[in-house]
From Swiss-Prot:
The lineage of its organism: Eukaryota, Fungi, Dikarya, Ascomycota, Pezizomycotina. Residues 1-130, 279-314 are annotated as: Disordered. GO terms for cellular component: cytoplasm; nuclear periphery. Its EC number is 1.3.1.89, 1.3.1.-. Belongs to the Dus family. Dus3 subfamily. This is tRNA-dihydrouridine(47) synthase [NAD(P)(+)]. PROSITE patterns: UPF0034 (PS01136), ZF_C3H1 (PS50103). The gene is dus3. It comes from Aspergillus niger (strain ATCC MYA-4892 / CBS 513.88 / FGSC A1513). Residues 1-22 have a biased composition (Low complexity). The keyword Repeat applies.
Length: 748
């Protein structure tokens, strides 16, 4: 069990030391034994593998052999501590074991009674409500005290209209963090939540009117507003892009939005597939009994090839062409210098992605959105498509990079959307809606890897791996209706450990299956890139990702890319619109990348074009910096705390600095802290490189703050949040996603 700290009063953020300064000291009255071991925090260190460890990854001062599955922490930092009240279950419980206990739906029985499970997910989690005692009417919120707008609800309005009453009785006192300055107003020169802001005192004042009365007014700083420089011209004044308008969401909810491509294509696919299926079944039933020779051998190869060719010709004459062809797509590029941040459920929010982009992430993805709620205009689902303007900038490329013909880096961007669907028509309509409502997307990625039972049993996510024909149809249809946005797909090795099918599925996506060869002149399904997570759905995180299997898939895609012309149907020249990314399909590997050593090994030995990172950046978001620098970065505790502070500022910009926005920021911060606390500083390790699945014994950090950041106690996470977001609302609640702080569902 990792240690928890005493519940002492921590210093305010403005009192925290600089990254190079001493760490805050614990109050001696608390009697914390860790204070006796207090060490001055070292500055951030850059350690190359060659400098810090010998060739087998063992440091010179570490004679003890490395134990599998256990983080090799130096003995002087290991402590023996019993679990304390309020602490979460030990990390000795494997992540997937906790989830398996939940999904299995069975519990051990003793004396005829079910034992209460101590592991598994905290289902039906609630976070309470962070809101004012009584809300302020929108007719007042952005107006001077004596000049409110007319309330459309009149006397029936249930919100407060008296500004001073609201500020005095219904709104909590202003926060004093960030020196009492509203982070949003400090950056933009105006606050986007008006009088509801928890820092409203920093951008409001009382002015005397002509009749001698005192009037409360909001202030905007024109100088700050002039300094704001939008990174892209289509960003909103808050720096957000891909914001679905209320009109579009209402049109979707009321089924008023037209789908001129998805509708006809879905109807064509349904009719044609039904005809194909009927014809195939009829031919199977009509197969002659004497088709085999006396020796049991089948007909000779030439005869079979001739029959197959005749059959294809007959089908092409019989079946109607699709109502339209795909639009030519923007060209993509993935390379060794472009590490990608994986789509992450809950954790892949805009503030976290923005932080990762600053630290070197070249590609980001939205959280997985379900297609049906998107089509229905669901507000929360469309909110997942919001991106920061920094995600609209082109990726960094090395000079001389091997790019496909027609690729224009200046028109490229970092952010893509990921969706899940269990029916082709849902995927088609969601794709067309995204292309129409949020056109600033690098790609639209189809999730075929999500292992969550709720998604799998609905036929989406990794369930599509068991239905390759259906998956291929979805990719083809998405590619047809997505306008200029390329389509990509993320898959797993398979659903079962003993039956990986990613190789066959990859080949099908590049060459096309038998059924679709009867409908299409060209083989490729249209996926511009394929990402393979080197685990099965059944495996979850019980073992390391299988990079040997990923390497096999990479080799297959390389061979097929090189022989595209040879395997393409030669009846006619392939239409450029049907060729994904100019004929080249990129391949990304995903799984367990936790250091620049892992990244370089995968690039050089697995043959992937790039690596997608999921859990690694959640634990240490500066992993992108390490990859770029080619060395370990031993971040100090105060440097890590500065990242947390930056996340809080970005959260207030994204969700608002009012009571609701502060509560939302706190919730997602604590979700993230449940990952960051797993980080073991490089300076504490005996062996390198670190492994993401290694579990540390209870340890203390090099100073009090480092120990606090490693705490497994969610109450300590709340304490960290209060350093920047002030005391939590009385109704705020937080329950860790897993009782053992598992993180199996973070990445699909």
């Amino acid at each position: 069990m990792e240690p928890t700290t005493a519940q002492e009063q921590l210093p305010a953020p403005e009192q925290l030391p600089a990254p190079e300064a001493n760490a805050p000291k614990r109050d001696p009255e608390n009697g914390d034994a860790a204070a006796d071991h207090q060490a001055q925090e070292p500055p951030s260190k850059k350690a190359r593998l060659d400098d810090s460890a010998d060739s087998n990854g063992q440091t010179a001062d570490a004679p003890a052999p490395r134990m599998k599955g256990v983080a090799p922490i130096k003995p002087e930092f290991i402590i023996d501590q019993q679990p304390t009240r309020g602490q979460t279950a030990s990390d000795a419980n494997a992540d997937d074991a906790a989830e398996a206990a939940h999904h299995d739906g069975r519990a051990d029985e003793q004396n005829g009674k079910k034992k209460k499970k101590k592991t598994g997910q905290n289902t039906n989690r609630t976070f309470g409500r962070s809101e004012d005692a009584k809300g302020l009417c929108s007719s007042v919120n952005f107006r001077p005290e004596f000049s409110p707008a007319e309330c459309t609800f009149g006397e029936k309005c249930r919100y407060e209209h008296d500004l001073r009453t609201y500020l005095k009785e219904h709104k909590r006192e202003d926060l004093t963090t960030f020196n009492g300055m509203c982070p949003v107003w400090d950056v933009h020169g105006k606050c986007f939540v008006g009088w509801k802001c928890r820092f409203v005192g920093s951008h409001s004042e009382e002015r005397e009117t002509a009749d001698g009365r005192k009037e409360l007014v909001l202030i905007e700083d024109e100088e700050r507003k002039k300094k704001v420089q939008r990174l892209v011209p289509f960003a909103g004044e808050d720096g957000a892009v891909n914001v679905a308008s209320m009109e579009d969401k209402i049109a979707l909810a009321r089924r008023k939005m037209d789908f001129p491509r998805a509708g006809p294509y879905s109807a064509w696919l349904e009719n044609t597939s039904r005809t194909i299926e009927k014809e195939l079944h009829k031919r199977h039933r009509a197969a002659p009994v004497g088709a085999e020779t006396k020796d049991g051998e089948s007909k000779d190869a030439e005869s079979k090839d001739a029959d197959s060719k005749d059959e294809k010709e007959e089908n092409r004459a019989m079946y109607v062409e699709p109502p339209f062809m795909p639009s030519e797509k923007r060209r993509l590029y993935f390379g060794p210098e472009t590490p990608a941040l994986a789509p992450l459920t809950t954790q892949g929010n805009m503030p976290f992605r923005r932080l990762c982009v600053e630290l070197g992430a070249q590609f980001t993805y939205s959280e997985m959105a379900m297609s049906l709620p998107l089509i229905q205009g669901n507000k929360s689902e469309w909110a997942l498509m919001r991106a920061h303007e920094s995600e609209m900038l082109p990726p960094t490329m090395l000079p001389g990079a091997d790019i496909v013909q027609g690729y224009d880096n200046s028109k490229d961007m970092k952010f893509g959307a990921q969706i899940a669907a269990n029916k082709p028509w849902q995927a088609f309509k969601a794709t067309e809606a995204l292309a129409k409502v949020t056109p600033n997307l690098r790609v639209i990625d189809l999730n075929c890897g999500c292992p969550i039972d709720l998604v799998f049993k609905d036929g989406a996510g990794s369930a599509l791996l068991e239905h390759p024909s259906k998956l291929e149809k979805i990719i083809r249809g998405m590619n047809t209706v997505s306008d200029q946005i390329p389509i990509t797909v993320k898959i797993r090795m398979g659903t079962k450990d003993n039956n990986p099918n990613a190789l066959k599925l990859t080949e099908r996506l590049l060459l096309g299956g038998y059924e679709t060869s009867l409908l299409h002149h060209d083989g490729a399904a249209g996926a511009a890139a394929i990402t393979l997570h080197g685990r099965s759905r059944q495996q979850r995180y019980t073992r390391q990702a299988d990079w040997e299997y990923i390497s096999e898939c990479a080799a297959l895609i390389k061979r097929l890319n090189e022989k595209t012309d040879a395997v393409t149907d030669t009846i006619r020249e392939p239409d450029a619109r049907t060729q994904p990314n100019g004929g080249k399909v990129y391949f990304l590997g995903n799984g367990d990348c936790y250091s620049h050593v892992d990244y370089d090994n995968h690039i050089n030995n697995a043959g992937v074009d790039a690596v997608m990172l999921g859990r690694g950046p959640l634990i240490k978001p500066w992993l992108f910096e390490e990859i770029q620098a080619g060395q370990y970065l031993d971040k100090s505790a105060t440097e890590r705390l500065a990242m947390i502070e930056k996340f809080c500022k970005y959260g207030l910009e994204a969700w608002g600095s009012d009571e609701h926005g502060v509560g939302t920021t706190r919730r997602f911060l604590m979700e993230w802290l449940s990952f960051t606390r797993r980080y073991v500083p490089i300076g504490l390790l005996e062996h390198l490189p670190p492994y993401i699945n290694d579990r540390p014994p209870a340890f203390r950090g090099r100073n009090e703050l480092e120990t606090l950041l490693a705490s497994a106690n969610y109450k300590d996470w709340l304490k960290i949040s209060e350093m920047f977001l002030g005391p939590a609302h009385k109704d705020f609640k937080f329950e860790p996603k897993h009782k053992s702080n598992s993180y199996d569902e973070a990445e699909g």
